[in-house]
Amino acid sequence: MRLLRRRHMPLRLAMVGCAFVLFLFLLHRDVSSREEATEKPWLKSLVSRKDHVLDLMLEAMNNLRDSMPKLQIRAPEAQQTLFSINQSCLPGFYTPAELKPFWERPPQDPNAPGADGKAFQKSKWTPLETQEKEEGYKKHCFNAFASDRISLQRSLGPDTRPPECVDQKFRRCPPLATTSVIIVFHNEAWSTLLRTVYSVLHTTPAILLKEIILVDDASTEEHLKEKLEQYVKQLQVVRVVRQEERKGLITARLLGASVAQAEVLTFLDAHCECFHGWLEPLLARIAEDKTVVVSPDIVTIDLNTFEFAKPVQRGRVHSRGNFDWSLTFGWETLPPHEKQRRKDETYPIKSPTFAGGLFSISKSYFEHIGTYDNQMEIWGGENVEMSFRVWQCGGQLEIIPCSVVGHVFRTKSPHTFPKGTSVIARNQVRLAEVWMDSYKKIFYRRNLQAAKMAQEKSFGDISERLQLREQLHCHNFSWYLHNVYPEMFVPDLTPTFYGAIKNLGTNQCLDVGENNRGGKPLIMYSCHGLGGNQYFEYTTQRDLRHNIAKQLCLHVSKGALGLGSCHFTGKNSQVPKDEEWELAQDQLIRNSGSGTCLTSQDKKPAMAPCNPSDPHQLWLFV
């Protein structure tokens, strides 16, 4: 049978050839025929018949073509990709010689103050030294005396990262992009600012470092003016740009980004030190996916001794970014599913939010995603806003554990803010109105200042940001909670009661006291109407929550009133009787487990046998 098919093959080819020649002849004649048909109506029917014949012939030719043996497999069609692949890059991996730092460190004295990242130590102080130290703390909120005596180019000792980080190789294709390092400062100490700069120069491969841009947010200190300009000229790739008016971190970073020339923007604070191999893992992840915003593993530089908390070879317990319903950024340990997903320290950590001080991002993606909200003022809320925006609009936030950068964490800011701290509330309202949908109500219940701004619409024009959300086809906030941060407890959108709990006997309000994260006694305090320590919710599950940040519940244990972590978490959980409360019409607040009622007798909240005639047991949500 196969032999017979092969013998007939030439005949089929000849038939196809003849049919094709006849088709060309008729097609040539067709042009003149159509022109004549328009003038001679009697020819129209013949032309239409010829069209039908041509259709039949074409169909026959297609059938013959399809019935012929497939002698050659076609090459697969090229698939479109989101980003073009660089065809000029070399195969293999970057060598240590290629990743040589921009500058080699000068010889180090191992006995120098703070050498190898060790703590600054001093046992004897003169009166002048003590005065200098105290003035440094007052001015910078860290030990500037110690910083000033540590080398600007100090080494941090050997590379102590886990072996998989030290041995990590980076592919040449796609190539690692160049980066512009942007450092914003305002009246920063000379030593911490310059140590940050030198740290970048000594740890960053020359082929990857395009420039270091120092953005001055209207500093008033003389050493940060002409002296700084002259000093950085010797550093080749360092330049200073300035905001003449104090506009804050957000605007300053936008200024730095606008003049940056590299493919990737890397933002650092002005009191950092970079560890071995900090940049390459960040750039490698962006080379894999330009929609990923990556942060280093941020470790502590002690604000008193400037000791650098070095990574350890066995790895450490990692944290990721979170937020609470007052829209404050925080840290939390990794959930089990994230620990299981990561095989070793080279695997990135998915993070619902990021600190926002230290990160790298593709410049083109930064612009695509909407940079920063340029109507936000000074500082505050911009990191949470960007976190929501990146995730909801198709990007990702990741922490790269093999990238380690130290940061001086201060307990308070040494700087004053134009317009006061109300700018933070205004920034938070802007992010809530654009990204949080109906969940913004949860925030407004906890921040009455923000709620008032929202009601009065005194937070500026957000039309451009809403248009950006629409243009990028971003997900809603419910999607974010379900897919990015399912561990987040979502309070009732409409709790049964909320606000301050006022006692009719004392005219004071129930208050959790300062810094009560659970375990401390509650107090009675003058009602201030600002929420905060006096904010409570009576939920549909019948628990009484103080949940500005942590979810804390009132409970009764051994007859005593207490405040602790809530047992109801929304999934496969229930409210225990000692946390369940009944708000009766007689204004008593009765605990279901003990059967006793909340009282303010002796101006201290406690439990007592229920007595509706006692005004100290009568409460009202206000």
UniProtKB/Swiss-Prot annotation:
SMART domains documented for this protein: RICIN
UniProt KW ATP-binding keyword: no
Tissue expression as described in the entry: Expressed in placenta and trachea. Weakly expressed in brain and pancreas. Expressed in fibroblast. Weakly or not expressed in lung, liver, muscle, kidney, spleen, thymus, prostate, testis, ovary, intestine, colon, leukocyte, stomach, thyroid, spinal cord, lymph node, trachea, adrenal gland and bone marrow.
Region ranges (Catalytic subdomain A): 176-285
Coiled-coil annotated spans: none
Enzyme Commission designation: 2.4.1.41
Alphabetized SUPFAM superfamilies for the sequence: Nucleotide-diphospho-sugar transferases, Ricin B-like lectins
Segments passing through the bilayer: 9-28
Glycosylated sites: N86, N476
GO cellular component, one term: perinuclear region of cytoplasm
Entries under Pfam families matching the protein: Glycos_transf_2, Ricin_B_lectin
Metabolic or biological pathway: Protein modification; protein glycosylation
GO biological process: O-glycan processing; protein O-linked glycosylation; protein O-linked glycosylation via threonine
Domain named Ricin B-type lectin: residues: 506-622
Reaction it catalyzes: L-seryl-[protein] + UDP-N-acetyl-alpha-D-galactosamine = a 3-O-[N-acetyl-alpha-D-galactosaminyl]-L-seryl-[protein] + UDP + H(+); L-threonyl-[protein] + UDP-N-acetyl-alpha-D-galactosamine = a 3-O-[N-acetyl-alpha-D-galactosaminyl]-L-threonyl-[protein] + UDP + H(+)
Gene3D superfamilies xref list: 2.80.10.50, Spore Coat Polysaccharide Biosynthesis Protein SpsA, Chain A
Membrane-protein topology: Single-pass type II membrane protein
Similarity annotation: Belongs to the glycosyltransferase 2 family. GalNAc-T subfamily.
PANTHER family: N-ACETYLGALACTOSAMINYLTRANSFERASE, POLYPEPTIDE N-ACETYLGALACTOSAMINYLTRANSFERASE 6
Entry function: Catalyzes the initial reaction in O-linked oligosaccharide biosynthesis, the transfer of an N-acetyl-D-galactosamine residue to a serine or threonine residue on the protein receptor. May participate in synthesis of oncofetal fibronectin. Has activity toward MUC1A, MUC2, EA2 and fibronectin peptides. Glycosylates FGF23.
Comment, domains: There are two conserved domains in the glycosyltransferase region: the N-terminal domain (domain A, also called GT1 motif), which is probably involved in manganese coordination and substrate binding and the C-terminal domain (domain B, also called Gal/GalNAc-T motif), which is probably involved in catalytic reaction and UDP-Gal binding.
Official protein name in the record: Polypeptide N-acetylgalactosaminyltransferase 6
Organism from which the protein derives: Homo sapiens (Human)
Gene that encodes the chain: GALNT6
